[in-house]
Amino acid sequence: MSLAHSLICGCLMRESTEDTARFLEYPGIGLVEWRLDALHGIHTRNGLDEALAGLSLPGRHPVIATVRPERFRGGFRGTEEARIRALERTVRAGAEWIDLEDDLPEDVLSPFRDSAARVVISHHDFDGTPASDPLKHRVEHLATLGAHVLKIATYARTVEDNLRVLELIPFARKQFGAETIAFCMGPTGRWSRLACLLMGSPWTYVRFPELPASAPGQFTVAQMQTLLEIVGAG
């Protein structure tokens, strides 16, 4: 695998577990974010167990397990307790990464930090992009939560919105020693999904061509591969 391909994380958004192996072993990427909240059977134990069997595939990519709640425009409609239990079972099944929202209390975050999985703490703003100071305060808050990687995604309405978000990557590294993924969603923010890699983000999120995007503005796997080749990354 080339360095450029290792920077690409494919987002698996699918109601069915059929053909899961093809996406977990998809060529030309380095990771898969599995949006388990999109699964039709996520609210039942058997449905989740059937899906998690895919984590036993020997040749799969590392997986970032995500069960996004409705409050962050995710598909999980059960109780918060049930959602956390689903995440715990996903870690026990062998997911290498777990994505957790930054509004979770410490007593929920702590067991995940102590688990075998690495933790992404994420913050999403689907309404817009705050000013620079509130964004930096948000990074400061995320950095206190003990994650391996911080993630901030806001919705861009102007080109300048992207610049404020992208500057969080070197800011977080310099101030807190934190690896940070920071980009903007939406049509105006699309280019930041490439630029964040050039600024030092460890990976960026793309969609599989056959599947829906997990957030507005995502490139396909092939599009991001081409863009990385054009700019000479990796």
UniProtKB/Swiss-Prot annotation:
HAMAP family reported in the protein's UniProt record: AroD
Keyword set includes Amino-acid biosynthesis: yes
Keywords assigned by UniProt, alphabetized: Amino-acid biosynthesis, Aromatic amino acid biosynthesis, Lyase, Schiff base
GO process terms (BP): 3,4-dihydroxybenzoate biosynthetic process; amino acid biosynthetic process; aromatic amino acid family biosynthetic process; chorismate biosynthetic process
Domain of life: Bacteria
InterPro entries assigned to the protein according to its UniProt record, in alphabetical order: Aldolase_TIM, DHquinase_I, Type-I_3-dehydroquinase
Pathway of action: Metabolic intermediate biosynthesis; chorismate biosynthesis; chorismate from D-erythrose 4-phosphate and phosphoenolpyruvate: step 3/7
Lineage: Bacteria, Pseudomonadati, Thermodesulfobacteriota, Syntrophobacteria, Syntrophobacterales
Binding locations of 3-dehydroquinate: E33, W34, R35, R68, R193, S214, Q218
Catalysed reactions, as listed in the record: 3-dehydroquinate = 3-dehydroshikimate + H2O
Keyword set includes Heme: no
Record text on subunit structure and interactions: Homodimer.
EC code(s) of this entry: 4.2.1.10
Gene Ontology MF terms in the entry: 3-dehydroquinate dehydratase activity
Annotated catalytic residues: H124, K151
Stated family: Belongs to the type-I 3-dehydroquinase family.
Record's protein name: 3-dehydroquinate dehydratase
Function, in words: Involved in the third step of the chorismate pathway, which leads to the biosynthesis of aromatic amino acids. Catalyzes the cis-dehydration of 3-dehydroquinate (DHQ) and introduces the first double bond of the aromatic ring to yield 3-dehydroshikimate.
